[in-house]
From Swiss-Prot:
Similarity-based family: Belongs to the universal ribosomal protein uL16 family.
Function description: Binds 23S rRNA and is also seen to make contacts with the A and possibly P site tRNAs.
The keyword rRNA-binding belongs to this UniProt entry's keyword annotation: yes
Record protein name field: Large ribosomal subunit protein uL16
Organism from which the protein derives: Coprothermobacter proteolyticus (strain ATCC 35245 / DSM 5265 / OCM 4 / BT)
Keyword vocabulary terms for this entry: Ribonucleoprotein, Ribosomal protein, RNA-binding, rRNA-binding, tRNA-binding
Amino acid sequence: MLMPKRVKYRKNHLPHIKGKETRGLKLAFGDYGIQAVGRGYVDSRMIESCRVIMAKNIGKTGKYWIRIFPDVAWTKKPLEVRMGGGKGDPEKWIFPVKPGRIMFELTGVDEDTAKHIARLIGFRLPFEVRLISRV
């Protein structure tokens, strides 16, 4: 799973996901992109699940790019622990997604396959996504 090699601070505040995305709005590498319509936090397990879907469905001729990286720690206190005692330990790594962010890009596939991949990826993420194309 994806995670940073090292970070300056182990525990951080959660970033805001209000408003629209200002970066990562255009296709940079592939012919098709999977763009977020909703907002939410994507963790490294979700990204890995989407990567497996793309790798299985693209085949040997296609190529894919992952344009997001989980570099924010998500902390959680253990179960049945009383209030206080500081912030919990990091549990997973997340990436905050706002509407408009292109998360994955594909090339070397036809439009039907790209639509199928976008549909499968939409089931794995906690918000709605759509397929965009360069053409």
